[in-house]
């Protein structure tokens, strides 16, 4: 009898040991891609963003990452043209927090070291003045061809300023409220064929 009691006590000790273990901890995050589809091969000028932007706050630098945003430019040639100019201008760049705080972030846009501003045009190509567009140079070479010409380049996007409530500016992004900001960054492109 003593042996049975001792055996039952030992079994109870071994089976009860696992109960004191810590519970598993799991975390989950969701990645979201914006999705639309569009085809335009007849307009004189078509600019297509080649991706979307997603800024992440990095605690170690107390700031947001910057991103290269690629785009594709297609133009229809004009055989009577003697010069071609392509410019860009920032239209919208404010992201607003998706809660009641009213917090905003402003996105800066940079093209080859030059800020793209709302107040003026940034020259990307100007064949009359010898600005041939770097990665966009196929457009500078094909603007007077009888077919369509395409080229790809990119802007650098970064968070350049923010507010905690829509009016109070922050200099330290770590003081921003937690959450998600959303909005559009729009750049207008203007092409001019001179005959």
From Swiss-Prot:
Signal sequence annotation: 1-22
Protein family: Belongs to the EcpA/MatB fimbrillin family.
Xref: Gene3D superfamilies: Fimbrial protein EcpA (2.60.40.3290)
Subunit note: Self-associates. Forms filaments. Interacts with EcpD.
Pfam families: MatB
GO CC list: pilus
Protein name (record): Common pilus major fimbrillin subunit EcpA
Keywords attached to this entry: Fimbrium, Signal
InterPro entries registered for this protein in UniProt: EcpA, Fimbrillin_EcpA_sf
Coiled coil: none
Induction: Negatively regulated by H-NS. Positively regulated by IHF and EcpR.
Name of the gene encoding the protein in the UniProt record: ecpA
UniProt entry tagged with the keyword Signal: yes
Its job: Part of the ecpRABCDE operon, which encodes the E.coli common pilus (ECP). ECP is found in both commensal and pathogenic strains and plays a dual role in early-stage biofilm development and host cell recognition. Major subunit of the fimbria.
Record's subcellular location: Fimbrium
Main location: other
């Amino acid at each position: 009898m003593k042996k049975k009691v001792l055996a039952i006590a030992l079994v109870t000790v071994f089976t009860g040991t696992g109960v004191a273990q810590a519970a598993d901890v799991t975390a989950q995050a969701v990645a979201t891609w914006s999705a639309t589809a569009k085809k335009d091969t007849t307009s004189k000028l078509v600019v297509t963003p080649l991706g979307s932007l997603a800024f992440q706050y990095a605690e170690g630098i107390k700031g947001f990452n910057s991103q290269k945003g690629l785009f594709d430019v297609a133009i229809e040639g004009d055989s009577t043209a003697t010069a071609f100019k392509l410019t860009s201008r920032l239209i919208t760049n404010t992201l607003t927090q998706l809660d009641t705080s009213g917090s905003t972030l402003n996105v800066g846009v940079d093209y080859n070291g030059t800020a793209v501003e709302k107040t003026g045009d940034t020259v990307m190509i100007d064949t009359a003045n010898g600005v041939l567009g770097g990665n966009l140079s196929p457009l500078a070479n094909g603007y007077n061809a009888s077919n369509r010409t395409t080229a790809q380049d990119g802007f650098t996007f970064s968070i350049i300023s923010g507010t905690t409530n829509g009016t109070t500016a922050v200099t330290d992004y770590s003081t921003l409220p937690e959450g998600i900001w959303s909005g559009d960054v729009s750049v207008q492109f203007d092409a001019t064929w001179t005959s």
